[in-house]
Amino acid sequence: MRKLTIIGGGFAGLTAALTAAEAGTEVTVHEAHRTLGGRARTADGPYRTNEGPHALYSGGPHWTWLKQRGLLPALAALPPAEAVRFRVHRDGALRRTPPLGLFRQARRTAEEAPVDLDFHTWATGLAGERTARVAAAYSGVALFHHDPGSLSARFVQERLHRATCLPPEAHYPRGGWGELIERMATRARELGVRIETSSRVDALPLGGGPVIVATALPAAARLLGDPSLTWESGRTVLFDLALRTRKGDPFVISDLDAPGWIERYTAQDPSLAPAGQQLLQAQLPIGPDASKADGVAHAERLLDLGFPGWRERTVWRRESVSQGRTGAVDRPGTTWRDRPAVDRGDGVYLVGDGVAAPGVLAEVSFTSAVEAVSLALRADLPRHRLDLKRA
């Protein structure tokens, strides 16, 4: 039987494991941590947090793939009464509706935007500087970057367009992303995949067939001894907060003065926190010279405006900095094709959200994982033809 080793048991690693196992491959997954999921882990109670604000977009190929296999978990529905509590922060105040120019800019597709020009310059030429700033700030929800306007116009526009489309693409697994990971892991085991947790791999295994490295780029660079495995990513403060419930709190605050996003996840999924409490997760991008305190102060200013008495209502909070863990960002003149290649040669393949694969957020991990399995099995067995029509 064909053999494949996968290092990393996050969303990308499990996607690769399932794809290979469906093709009749003997798969072993090594996960260094005690639990699977990587950045898709959900904390155990009482506060079932993800690693920062997370959503599962329905417009990418991963959605169809998961749905066809019955792997999509139950999804949390947002009540209409909560949906109308979406707020934007603009010119120092909270408002119910974003400026019309944001929607006009967001309607443009990624293909209309240039690769070689930064987003701010391109959008300013079309809609004026004010709209360009607002649109760049809003796109931060899918970028986790402090200055989206400096990035490639096509890269930013794709995310802006996807993040604002109607009906919304963003969906929320009930109970957190960990529910999706658990379903994927269960199916993988049913297909015969051997999953070894607390199994740290410090050197590439030899003689066991192709190897797929499904780790963050810094870990992959150390494992492969290749310092060139780098690509720019965001740097953001993650701010988690549990409050005693108060009727009328916003569902979302999107900062249009500077990239920042606060979301009350219990609005659609009360199971994420104990009864009588609300769980908020926020991300506040910070520049290379800014500190965690700067991001926390940003969050607190927004909370002061939107969540009256939040300090007195706080029952739990947590803050951290996420650096290089939020997916690739592309500078002007570059696209996803310029990122580290999936095929590293000699039967080694690299997958994840920082590699050369298309898509938004988790879609990059998915697409690279399917591509890596296709390449690995094609190279390992020239006569083998992997049917990826369902992927």
Outline where the language-model segments fall.
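Conserved flavin/dinucleotide-binding core of flavoenzymes
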Residues: Y265, S271-A391
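Rossmann-like flavin
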Residues: E82, V88-L94, P98-H161, L166-Y172
